[in-house]
Amino acid sequence: MAKVFKDIWLIPKLVLVTLVSFSCVHLTYCQEKIITVEAETIEYKRIDTISLNLHIYKPLNFSNDSTYNCIVFFHGGGWNNGHPNAFKRQSMYLASRGIIAISAEYRIKNKHNTTPFESVEDAKSAMRYIRKHARKLSINPNMIAAGGGSAGGHLAAACGNIIGLENPNEDLSISSVPNALALLNPVIDNGPDGYGYQRIKERYLEISPIHNITNGAPPTIILIGTKDKLIPVSTVETYKDNMETMGSRCDLVLYKNQEHAFFNKGEYFIDTTYQIDRFLKSLGYLKGPNTIKK
């Protein structure tokens, strides 16, 4: 069936596909700048001498006596490199909106000589640690979303869809599955025609999110540029169709003429953060009006 796109295409009650173009649109912050929130750092996992940390951004009015919804971000970098500060601004903004935002470290090839499989294991360990210690962290264990960009989006999607790749030494009775997913130009296909296949090869079915969507997959939003040379739009459209076939929500926001890793740049940072805000609000994670754009 042919799809017709306008600059912004909205379906009442549920955003299905949105195509965003900024050729004639100039977005501005409602806040003069995002409120600075200093992250607290705690170790969630140790492998021999490797320490992996969570960088936790709390609301300004944080109280240990309250319980907060949460989102956990995983940075991109092809499972090779990257830094949790990649999602610092998103984390500070969402903390200013009243939830706890966390940016998680995980093992990467250039630093730890690891493969994507270890990266997925660490992402699952991070989700499990947060849920296990939810009371201590003042987090609602049933409202923990995950998000990320590129390979970090893959890790979030893998937590939501992949069975296995868990650390057997952890308490596997505690779920590592996020309750929602916010994915920015995510790696979702590791098959022969997808990204990263040369590193994964015949094991791709163990780690490829698009090949493992099942009933009950977490509600998801995907934000991607139409000129992304690493993640074809057709791939995310197939992912969306598969999600909906399984009865799960999957919103897709396309950014006209944008390439891979566009989302931290200028007006695209503003709008992608706004779209994530709107998505999380629709699921009850956030309340009140957004403060990221007019």
Language model feature labels by segment:
Residues Q31-S66:
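N-terminal cap/lid segment of alpha/beta-hydrolase-fold proteins
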Residues I222-I224, D228:
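Short beta-strand/loop motif that positions the catalytic acidic residue
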Residues S66-G76:
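Short beta-strand element of the alpha/beta-hydrolase
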Residues M1-I34:
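Bacterial Sec-dependent N-terminal signal peptides
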Residues S125-Y195, Y204, P209:
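Primarily recognizes the serine-hydrolase "nucleophile elbow" in alpha/beta-hydrolase
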Residues H55, V233, E237-K240, E244-K294:
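C-terminal catalytic histidine-bearing segment of alpha/beta-hydrolase fold enzymes
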Residues H75-N80, S150:
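Active-site glycine-rich loops that stabilize anionic/oxyanionic intermediates
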Residues H83-P84, Q90, A104-P141, K265-F269:
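Catalytic nucleophile-loop/oxyanion-hole region of alpha/beta-hydrolase
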